[in-house]
Regions:
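Flexible glycine/proline-rich, aromatic-decorated loop/lid segments
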Residues: 260, 393-403, 459-473, 484-498
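Glycine-rich phosphate/pyrophosphate-binding loops
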Residues: 57-67, 431-452, 511-513
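A short, small-residue-rich loop immediately preceding and capping a beta-strand
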Residues: 37-39, 66-84, 102-104, 364, ...
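Conserved acidic/glycine
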Residues: 76, 81-85, 103-105, 109-420, ...
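Cofactor-binding active-site loop characterized by glycine-rich and histidine/acidic residues
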Residues: 1-97, 121, 377-380, 387, ...
Length: 516
């Protein structure tokens, strides 16, 4: 809105579906195709997508398909969101692959919807340990610069000790109850600390800020993160939920439910942040935007221009691919004669044909979650190589065989291990590379059909929202293929799940020629 990208009419339509004229409260590329790049709902989908977007960017550059450059993937998430398995489940990949092009910013306001994230503990320390253990560079932005004078003044070390020992539930209390409460309960534990703030008013104590609300500290963290090499970075920023709302909801458990501020709360918010709106205008709750020639707007526009334009911004311009002629699949269109073959085997043959095609072969990416041998794809290991940023530091035991396990810095296959969510996220990153990198790819994710939509349905819905372009192959499908392995291997319903996604076309091929 301040940049001029959103009109007042659009702002009026926030959280309203108005035939393309509304603003969705969550990121949805389908609803705002020129604006949002990534759908980050449900919770946890943003972090895992960010990891694999960064991973795929490195993959594409390793293969020489895009320039490596200095692009960064930024993911903004909450401390409560980190309890979602998808939020932290893939961070070891980022550390292992040394994805220095990835930055997480975790808004640690210490609260979930219902209550504290770790009322009896300290979520920032917990997350620090998890990320450090996974090989990440961790930057903590805990206390704002208004604390600096007190820290310098404290010669006993008690202030730092008190900061470290207090639990998150109490930190929430300090902001909710006002300056007198932290004077008594935070500083009051040690007489030396009470003396430290004896010359401060309760209001001054109340405005001892947290690091995530201090632009100087945040800038320093961002500068360090963008310059760091050899590791992904996570910034843990200490904030207050409902910051600025005062008694209307600051640090309150019901902040999320506050839909409208009364006149006194509006006046308090205006005064706190110095917004130039007169008393007689407050009840109308007008939008405030500085004039076009104001220093603020001119500065903002200069900075955005120097940084390459506004964010977010989604682009969908790319060069169209040339579809291979039908004769390319001549062998798959012929009868197999007396020999019966599975559609899974037929797919592998189709894939081999496509990879050899001169026009689109380099765009084909097979993705497997530790099932290549199950599907008879191991012949591609040596032919294409399995991508890894480290290459192959060991001699595989089967290196003298034709189909040995070959890892390569320029490998084509993405072998994601026993990790359907990761494999689907890699597929999603490649299936949207036409938009994110102006590099259209054709990813084929092949999986046990029962562990496809049933396992990663949320990511499949996100793929539809993202307008992803690629192929999902549910192999060994059917209720009779793997009866002996039990109910979890008897899939006769994947198409029902696939059909819930409007822009996902599903096929149930019975013969090789249909598949081709």
């Amino acid at each position: 809105f301040l940049e001029g990208r959103f009109s007042e009419e659009q702002m009026d339509n926030f959280r309203r579906e108005v035939d393309g004229g509304g603003l969705s409260s969550y990121p949805h590329p389908w609803l705002m195709p020129d604006y949002w790049q990534f759908p980050t709902v449900s919770m946890g989908l943003g972090p895992i997508q960010a990891i694999y977007q960064a991973h795929v960017m490195r993959y594409l550059s390793a293969r020489g398909l895009v320039a490596r450059g200095d692009r960064k993937v930024w993911a903004f998430l909450g401390d409560g969101e980190c309890d979602e398995p998808e939020s932290l489940g893939a961070i070891s990949l980022a550390g292992r692959e040394q994805l220095e092009n990835l930055i997480f910013v975790v808004n640690c306001n210490l609260q979930r919807l219902d209550g504290p994230v770790r009322g009896n503990g300290k979520i920032m320390q917990e997350l620090e340990g998890v990320f450090r253990g996974a090989g990440w560079n961790v930057i903590k932005v805990v206390w704002g610069r208004h604390w600096d004078r007190l820290i310098e003044k404290d010669t006993t070390g008690l202030l730092i000790k008190r900061m470290d020992e207090v639990c998150d539930g109490e930190l929430q209390n300090y902001k909710f109850n006002g300056g007198a409460y932290p004077r008594e309960h935070f500083f009051g534990k040690y007489p030396e600390l009470l003396e430290l703030v004896a010359d401060m008013t309760d209001e001054q104590i109340m405005y001892l800020n947290r690091g995530g609300h201090d632009p100087y500290k945040v800038y320093a963290a961002y500068a360090e993160a963008t310059a760091h090499k050899g590791q992904p970075t996570v910034i843990l920023a200490h904030t207050v939920k409902g910051y600025g709302l005062g008694g209307a909801g600051e640090a309150a458990n019901d902040t999320h439910s506050v839909k409208k501020l009364d006149i006194d709360s509006l006046r308090g918010f205006r005064d706190r942040f110095g917004i130039p709106i007169a008393d007689d205008q407050l009840e109308k709750v007008p939008y405030y935007r500085p004039a076009e020639d104001s220093p603020e707007i001119e500065y903002m526009r200069r900075r955005r221009a120097s940084l390459g334009g506004s964010l977010p911004a989604r682009k969908a311009d790319f060069n169209a691919m040339q579809t291979p002629p039908l004769k390319t699949f001549a062998k798959q269109l012929e009868s197999s004669g007396e020999r019966e073959i599975s559609t899974t085997m037929a797919f592998v043959r189709v894939l081999s044909t496509l990879i050899k095609d001169k026009s689109i072969g380099s765009s084909i990416v097979p993705i497997v979650p530790d099932e290549a041998r199950t599907f008879g794809m191991e012949g591609m290991f040596r032919q294409l190589g399995i991508y890894t940023s480290e290459g192959q530091k060991y001699v595989p035991h089967d290196h003298q065989q034709i189909m040995y396990y070959k890892e390569d810095k320029k490998g084509v296959i993405l072998e994601e291990g026993i990790n359907e969510a990761g494999a689907m996220s890699a597929w999603l990153a490649l299936a949207t590379a036409y938009s994110t990198s102006s590099c259209p790819m054709i990813p084929f994710y092949i999986f046990y059909s029962m562990f496809g939509f049933q396992r990663i349905g949320d990511l499949a819905w996100a793929a539809g929202d993202s307008q992803a372009r690629g192929f999902l192959i549910g192999a060994t499908a059917g209720r009779t293929t793997l009866n002996g392995e039990g109910l979890q291997h008897q899939d006769g319903h994947s198409h029902i799940l696939a059909n819930t996604i409007p822009n996902c076309r599903s096929y149930d091929a019975a013969y090789s020629y249909e598949l081709a």
